[in-house]
Amino acid sequence: MANKDKRICIIGGGPAGQTVAMNLEKKGYDNYVIYEKLNRVGGKCFSPKMKMGPKMDEERTIEMGAVMGCDTYFAVAEAEKFGGASHIGGPAMGRKFMTTEGKELKKGLAEKLNMLLKLNKMTKLLKKKYYGYDVNGHRGVAKGEYDGSLPTTPELKIVKGKNPNLKDLSMPFSEFLKMNKCEAAAPVWKGPFTSFGYGYFDEIPAAYVLKYLDGFTVRQFLSVGKLWTWKDGTQSIWEGVNKHLKHPAILNTEVTKIERKEDKVLVTLNGKDTEEFDDIIICTPLELFLKYGDSTEQEKELFSKIVHKEYFTMAVRTTPDPDISYYFFANMTPETRGHLMVFYHRWPGVINQPVVTFTLRNHEGCEDVPFEDAKKTTIADLAKAGLPVKATERIDDWYYFPHVSSKDYADGWYDKVEAMQGKNHTYYAGEVMAFGDMEETAEYARELVIRYF
């Protein structure tokens, strides 16, 4: 029998931590605490309000982090239901593909047809040859297995099975497409993947790309009218959950030290107060645990292999106002890292609104573009596109998309971490265990509670 009275420490109040707490409550666990070092919950779901409109007297949310969802966001839908948020009535998405000079990019008919043909081919291969590829998380993939939540089912049914072809998912996505003779389909995935900071296809294992943008989801991104947005911002989803929890997150509280004993865990907060727990669930970057936790040799070995993306967003006002979001495919290459890839124009028909720019600064094996250089380049790119910046409202430099290399993925990194779940009274959640978007993160956190509590 599970001990539902045990005291559980949840580190982090982002989508993972909120989902863990919500599902613990649903299973009858009432003795938990969430610690969040920021003054808000939601993590990279951050939706500050800014003034806009003809008289600059309308206050509306902008999105500095997570922007959108789609019809298979079932874990997010559970969070909406629990916390009272809704994507109904969110601002409609729209976009244009542009040259770096600000002219609309037109693809030839033959190029479009070839792209769609290869997309159809890849979709069929994913359904048959790579059955199980879209199962949440990475448990067993390096061994040719799948084991986790099936994201195409509203109940997020947990499935398990074997498929030796899944080992291919460890290779970089560009190699995966080439091996399957589907290179022409790459732009379909590049728009929602690279432009939003998740890296370049020659460096990122195919598993990350395809578990986030499975065959159904990537087609939803092709038809922007089907995408979800939130009038009150993605942050409102997790604020809603937090408000409805029996024990909302304790804000402005950083976990600064962890000591794991044989029968308890001592958690030090803000460098002074110490609390005692039976278990901890880490819902923040695992590699940061090495700085404050009493890491085992295995934790040190595995978590030191995690890499992340250097990615920042800026809310800027331009003259003139654009009327839609712009995507710059020419800047979505390793050689153009540090350039503007996309900006998000959130509110159709509303003038004087800031747009949010998205810029990626690093690539595996290459020198990082310094932050200040990338900032200047991004502003220059807007001017080049005919939208000079008149004011910068805010900048958020994110610790983004923790993941492992193709080599470490193929070497079974995930199975080694999964084998540590529950040892030393410790459980590992957070985005690295699935993917760096709110749905994959929430799905994994949900399933972790089902599996272990």
Predicted regions, residues:
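Conserved flavin/dinucleotide-binding core of flavoenzymes
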Residues: 345-453
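Mobile amphipathic helical/loop "lid" adjacent to a hydrophobic cofactor/ligand pocket
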Residues: 76, 80-82, 86-203
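Conserved Rossmann-like nucleotide-cofactor binding loop
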Residues: 16, 40, 287
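N-terminal Rossmann-like FAD-binding beta1-loop-alpha1 element of flavoenzymes
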Residues: 6-33
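Helical element adjacent to the flavin cofactor pocket in flavoenzyme catalytic cores
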Residues: 212-264
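Glycine-rich FAD pyrophosphate-binding loop
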Residues: 25-51
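Conserved FAD-binding subdomain of flavin-dependent enzymes
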Residues: 40, 44-47, 53-90
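Mid-domain catalytic core of redox enzymes
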Residues: 27, 256-369
